[in-house]
Each structure stands twice: as C-alpha cells, then as structure tokens.
Amino acid sequence: MKILNISYSDKFGGAAKSAYRIHKLLNSIKKIKSDMLVVKKLSKDKNVFTIDSTYLSLMFKFKNYLGILLSKFDNNNNPKSYNFFSSPFLQYINNSNYDLINLHWINAETLSIEDISKLNKPFIITMHDMWWLCGSENYLEYGDEKWKK
C-alpha cells in the first residue's frame, strides 16, 4: 500500500513532528510505502518532499500572509487558518498513484476546504488540533463551546 501523508511541515511544530513520526512508523511496516508532501521541509528524509519551485514557495507565503491578514477582521483572537486558497498540491495528489492520503495539519493554506472536496483518492484525517471541528480555529478559548452547535 502506498500512503501519502500531507502536512504543512515535517519538523516545524508539534503537529508536524507527530505527522513525521507516523510517516516513519508506516515505513517500518512491510508492504507499506509512506511518503510525505509538505510546504516546509526541514528533514533530510528522502521520502519527504515538496513541490520545489520558487514561484510556488512565494505563492504559499503570499497566501498564508493574506489568510493571516483576513483573520485580523475577525473579532476572535484565537489562532486560525481559513484555508481559502487552492493549492498546487491538489493536482499532484490527484495525478499520483497513492492508495491512501492521510491529511495531517494542513493549515496555513496547505490545502483549501474546496481542494479537499476535489480529492479523487480515499483519504483519512489525523487531527492534531481542533481545526477540523471548528472550521478555522486551531483551538478554542476555555469555555467556548460554539463549535458544538
């Protein structure tokens, strides 16, 4: 089985480190081949890669900055990521020969919600924070239970 793990980074932040450990564990299992697609690669692991392009690197930075700027108009100070903008990762994923996609921490405009709806491969989600439940916030302030509604 070929698995593609997708995360913003492989080593930058707790969720990234956890996703990377899962990727390494999967590669230790016979009959499983795991790769990891990231925006920000910090390891020397040959099975971790990004779509290497100066243009794409600048686009990710610009989209992330724009997303942060848009969040300033929200009266909520919780850390958030809207993931409005489409990603070049979508085309790569859909044209690949992976059997399963594992979505980890895809915030900072790694993949948009619309991109996820266009995936043509089976995927699973590994939750590293509350973003998947809250829609844009990474976690909620204590006592904030609006996400339950």
Give short role names for the model-derived ranges:
Residues 30, 35-100:
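A conserved catalytic-core segment of Leloir-type glycosyltransferases
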Residues 12-14, 43-47, 109-112, 131-142:
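Short catalytic/ligand-binding loop motif for oxyanion handling, primarily in non-cytosolic enzymes
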Residues 1-50, 96, 117-122:
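N-terminal subdomain of nucleotide-sugar transferases
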Residues 90-111, 122-128:
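Short N-terminal targeting/anchoring amphipathic segment
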Residues 111-117, 144-149:
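Short, intrinsically disordered, charge-balanced linker/junction segments flanking boundaries
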Residues 17-21, 84-85, 110-114:
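Short, conserved clusters of charged catalytic residues that mark active-site
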Residues 63-76, 125-149:
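Acceptor-binding helix/loop patch of EC 2.4 sugar-transfer enzymes
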